[in-house]
């Protein structure tokens, strides 16, 4: 019984505990919900407070709408944000987009202080708000003024059409801030643009907010500057914005980043633009993305606005109320320079970031029109780089031209000028490279004689210039040429008209680059050419007659050698001692083998303790392409006598030799497998030789052997094959073996070989002994095996 009572008692206790527990839970739930409600109200409060600072005194009235805004669906807030990002719209965005609340709130916080500061500075900004409202709509729609309604619908989807209206009011309150906040809101609102915006939100919050602050300071400056200056500044800003627009089209994120850069440049030079036309600054960052105030206007021609003439159009916009006119200037811009804009936009799109970076550096000249132009110029630099034929040269010219183009507000014109200069630069470099030879003229002595005969070491410019000309590209040549006296180019241009190309190895005009030789490895003209051209040219410099002289008594020394150590290739080396610019050519027989030229190197040799400048050309030809004993020629020709595909070797210094056989003459004797023949083979013969056979002490007559002659072939000299029949006799055991001697005598050499043929009888005896030994061994093994198998085994038991 006691056990039963205990069970009941425990059961009662359990039930009571359970009841108490459930009661507690209910209470907890209730408190939780109440807490949630309080949190909700707190959020609303925050929104209201944030909108108030942004609004500034006149905006205070719009704070209530802001509250409504907050209470309304978050999506609506997002739309509003597009219009005036600074407004509580940012917070609303946070509430609307639960995923990005933090980022939105951050942006709002930063933007709000900036907005408050900026608003007072820019009076015009207020009107901009109206434009901004349109922009907001655009931001939502992401590209059209008409989208206003659409934008509202989009933002309202969450549920707050009224909220959208309220937002408009708030926006009006924060025109200036709008530029900054707009980007943020856009991030929250737009979907397609949201990606852009989203990225922009993070970037905008930090970068964009900072921009707002900068804009404030910039705005002050703009206000101080005269309207004209502001217009100029605005022009720069607009250009930037325009560029941004293009970039924005490409990537919304870029737009956000651009906005940051834009404010920076704006702070210095475009600051006025930022404030005067928040639409401009905003348009820059927000127009594409969230369509800042200028979004509406920009929407009309967002890309065009980024257009090249943004400078011109914008100038008017800021001058007349940046607010209302903001839209108008946009249109004007569109009408004025849609084509140009388009052109610039394309190139700018990829280079937007670079352009803004440049603007940041240019910012020191904020109030001047030059600064504003600097931005476009930086942007433009990227544009022409795409179209310019020669990127390298254009870059050089653009660097020097940017300052000039900066003065002119027309971007297209600047591009034209830059290109023109580029082309002129190209010509200059061409002259430099092609007139290298002409520099020799300046090196001549007053009496008309050249300095080639000098035994003294070449002057410092000589060797490097020659080396550079040979081994570096054109740009290297032009660089090297700058070390030569400036009059070289003048002389080159002066005498360029006198020279005319001629067939048969005569030089063409240096201006046209006719120095090109048949083979790329050939040397190009050197400033130290020894010989002049055209014998038919009556008038030369210094009023002296120009005649192609025969090579002077001190002709360059040429050494030619052929190596035969390699089996597969014939290698030849030609060394020319000279201080002049020479081109080296090769011939085997009557055929040119320049295609096998391994190149020419420049070196210094010591002759009698004096350093001598020399050229070394190497030729490497497969033996299969070479017939031994053929004549090989190395020709060193003055570069000014080389033209077209032919070379007049009569005016060149040549060195010839005979290609030797690939190897040394050698003789070998071989015995046939059967031992019935002895063969003597001699190779690398220049001509058919005389052969003599000796067997033992007997010398065979000419009819005692046969011989075959194989003439010279590619890669192989003559071969002689001789054969002797071996007549066996019955040799007895112990008889001496026979020895064979083959002697081959050529015109310039004699070779021989000696071999001994073993005694055939002794060989048979050896075989017999070997066979006997093997047989006995096998028998022994068999016996052992038999014994092992037949041996009796012990019984197991």
Curated annotation (Swiss-Prot):
The keyword Membrane applies. Residues 212-373, 395-430, 445-457 have a biased composition (Low complexity). The chain crosses the membrane at residues 766-790. One of its GO terms (cellular component) is membrane. It is found in: Virion membrane. Glycans are attached at residue 590. InterPro entries: Varicellovirus_Gp2_glycop. Residues 1-25 form the signal peptide. Residues 374-394, 466-492 have a biased composition (Polar residues). Pfam families: Herpes_gp2. Residues 495-505 have a biased composition (Basic residues). This is Glycoprotein gp2. It comes from Equine herpesvirus 1 (strain Ab4p).
């Amino acid at each position: 019984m006691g056990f039963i009572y205990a069970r009941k008692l425990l059961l009662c206790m359990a039930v009571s505990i359970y009841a108490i527990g459930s009661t507690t839970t209910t209470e907890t739930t209730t408190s939780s919900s109440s807490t949630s409600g309080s949190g909700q109200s707190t959020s609303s409060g925050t929104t209201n407070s944030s909108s108030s600072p942004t609004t500034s005194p006149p905006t205070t009235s719009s704070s209530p709408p802001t509250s409504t805004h907050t209470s309304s669906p978050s999506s609506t807030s997002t739309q509003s944000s597009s219009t005036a990002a600074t407004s509580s719209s940012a917070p609303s965005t946070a509430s609307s987009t639960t995923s990005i609340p933090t980022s939105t709130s951050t942006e709002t916080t930063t933007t709000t202080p900036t907005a408050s500061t900026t608003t007072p500075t820019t009076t015009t900004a207020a009107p901009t708000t109206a434009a901004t409202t349109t922009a907001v709509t655009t931001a939502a729609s992401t590209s059209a003024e008409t989208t206003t309604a659409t934008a509202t619908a989009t933002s309202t989807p969450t549920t707050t059409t009224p909220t959208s209206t309220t937002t408009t009011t708030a926006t009006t309150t924060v025109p200036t801030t709008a530029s900054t906040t707009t980007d943020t809101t856009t991030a929250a609102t737009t979907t397609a643009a949201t990606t852009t915006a989203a990225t922009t939100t993070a970037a905008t919050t930090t970068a964009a907010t900072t921009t707002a602050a900068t804009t404030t300071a910039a705005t002050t400056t703009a206000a101080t500057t005269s309207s004209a200056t502001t217009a100029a500044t605005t022009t720069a800003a607009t250009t930037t914005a325009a560029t941004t627009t293009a970039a924005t089209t490409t990537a919304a994120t870029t737009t956000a980043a651009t906005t940051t850069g834009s404010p920076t440049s704006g702070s210095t030079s475009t600051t006025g633009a930022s404030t005067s036309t928040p639409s401009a600054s905003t348009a820059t960052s927000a127009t594409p993305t969230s369509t800042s105030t200028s979004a509406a206007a920009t929407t009309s021609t967002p890309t065009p606005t980024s257009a090249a003439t943004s400078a011109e159009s914008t100038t008017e916009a800021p001058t007349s109320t940046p607010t209302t006119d903001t839209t108008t200037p946009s249109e004007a811009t569109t009408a004025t320079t849609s084509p140009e804009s388009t052109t610039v936009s394309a190139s700018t799109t990829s280079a937007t970031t670079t352009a803004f970076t440049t603007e940041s550096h240019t910012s020191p000249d904020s109030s001047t029109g030059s600064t504003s132009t600097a931005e476009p110029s930086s942007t433009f630099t990227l544009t022409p780089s795409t179209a310019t034929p020669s990127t390298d040269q254009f870059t050089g010219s653009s660097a020097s031209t940017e300052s000039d183009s900066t003065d002119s507000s027309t971007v297209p014109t600047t591009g034209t000028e830059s290109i023109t200069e580029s082309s002129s630069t190209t010509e200059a470099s061409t002259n430099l490279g092609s007139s290298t030879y002409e520099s020799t003229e300046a090196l001549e002595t007053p009496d008309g004689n050249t300095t080639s005969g000098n035994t003294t070491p070449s002057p410092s410019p000589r060797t490097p210039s020659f080396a550079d000309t040979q081994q570096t590209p054109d740009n290297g040549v032009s660089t090297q040429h700058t070390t030569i006296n400036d009059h070289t180019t003048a002389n080159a241009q002066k005498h360029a008209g006198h020279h005319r190309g001629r067939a048969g190895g005569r030089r063409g005009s240096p201006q046209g680059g006719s120095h090109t030789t048949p083979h790329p490895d050939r040397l190009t003209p050197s400033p130290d050419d020894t010989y002049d051209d055209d014998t038919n040219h009556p008038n030369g410099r210094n009023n002296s007659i120009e005649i192609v002289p025969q090579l002077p008594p001190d002709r360059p020394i040429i050494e030619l050698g052929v190596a035969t150590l390699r089996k597969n290739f014939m290698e030849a080396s030609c060394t020319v001692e000279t201080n002049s610019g020479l081109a080296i050519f090769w011939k085997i027989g009557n055929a040119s083998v320049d295609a096998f030229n391994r190149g020419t190197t420049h070196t210094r040799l010591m002759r009698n303790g004096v350093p001598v400048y020399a050229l070394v050309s190497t030729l490497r030809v497969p033996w299969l392409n070479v017939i031994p004993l053929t004549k090989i020629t190395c020709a060193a020709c003055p570069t000014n006598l080389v033209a077209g595909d032919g070379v007049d070797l009569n005016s060149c210094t040549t060195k010839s030799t005979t290609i030797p056989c690939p190897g040394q003459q050698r003789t070998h004797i071989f015995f046939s497998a059967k031992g019935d023949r002895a063969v003597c083979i001699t190779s690398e013969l220049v001509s058919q030789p005389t052969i003599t056979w000796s067997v033992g002490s007997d010398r065979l007559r000419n009819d005692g052997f046969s011989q075959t002659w194989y003439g010279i072939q590619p890669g192989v000299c003559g071969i002689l094959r001789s054969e002797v029949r071996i007549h066996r006799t019955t040799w007895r055991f112990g008889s001496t073996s026979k020895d064979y001697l083959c002697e081959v005598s050529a015109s310039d050499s004699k070779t021989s070989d000696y071999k001994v043929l073993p005694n055939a009888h002794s060989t048979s005896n050896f075989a017999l002994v070997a066979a006997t030994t093997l047989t006995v061994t096998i028998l022994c093994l068999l016996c052992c095996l038999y014994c092992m198998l037949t041996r009796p085994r012990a019984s197991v038991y």
